[in-house]
Design a protein with these regions (language model features):
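Cleavable N-terminal export/targeting peptides
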Residues: 1-29
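Compositionally biased, intrinsically disordered low-complexity segments
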Residues: 8-9, 159-161, 213
Length: 217
């Protein structure tokens, strides 16, 4: 019984796991491989999470791939398909669908995640930009969730194909069933690699901290 309760809690936390860092509308590009992995912790309590995804570009607008979420006594595998297009410098739109399956329960279907990605530049030099992610998660045994992540970011170019991008934003539910949460962090770009330091729940006793890395080849 205790294990079942822990797994249900893990499923609840996994709804937010894939949406911690900002996702942009564009896909990886034709014939390219994108990978991302992260570790999430809450200092002071035993609640570690990992999230990993690999995506392969099919043309300039589509990508397909897999992902894996692990939490306390929980593990979920997902297959994804993604679409994205650039409408203009100021507005881009994309989306993603991910059915996920419980690796600890005979690979049974667990939940379906659907995402809408919007982003664009605010200034002509492309340094200041905005980004929103909307996640609709339909669970097999729990009520659905509908969350929104809204960020402002500023890109600071450095030397030798490097840059630093701090971002700040808020997380809220379109169902208005939870308080608005602050989120933010930065990523450091080195050529085709990004190193992430992120977090949310800053005003709680155990904030969530994320360290991640991604690449494109």
């Amino acid at each position: 019984m205790r294990k079942a309760i822990v797994c249900c809690l893990g499923l609840l936390f996994s709804m937010q796991a894939i949406a911690q860092i900002p996702y942009y509308a564009g896909t990886v590009g034709d014939g390219k491989l994108y990978g991302y992995t992260s570790l999430k912790v809450r200092p002071g309590i035993n609640r570690q999470e990992t999230y990993t995804t690999f995506q392969y570009g099919l043309g300039d607008h589509f990508a397909t791939g897999i992902d894996l979420y692990t939490g306390q006594n929980c593990a979920y595998w997902g297959a994804l398909i993604r679409y994205g297009t650039k409408v203009s410098q100021w507005f881009n739109i994309g989306g993603e669908i991910i059915p996920s399956f419980d690796l600890n329960n005979s690979f049974k279907f667990a939940y379906l995640s659907s995402a809408l990605y919007l982003n664009g530049d605010i200034t002509r030099d492309k340094r200041l930009f905005w980004c929103t992610n909307t996640w609709w998660v339909v669970n097999k045994e729990k009520p659905f969730t509908l969350s929104n992540y809204e960020y402002l970011g500023y890109n600071i170019p450095l030397k030798k194909q490097q840059s630093l991008t701090p971002m700040v934003g808020v997380i809220h539910s379109w169902l208005f069933d939870q308080d608005i949460d602050l989120a933010g962090g930065f990523y450091y770009t080195i050529k085709n690699w990004n190193l992430y330091v992120w977090g949310n729940d800053f005003l709680k006793s155990h904030p969530r901290l994320i360290a991640g890395i991604d690449f494109t080849f």
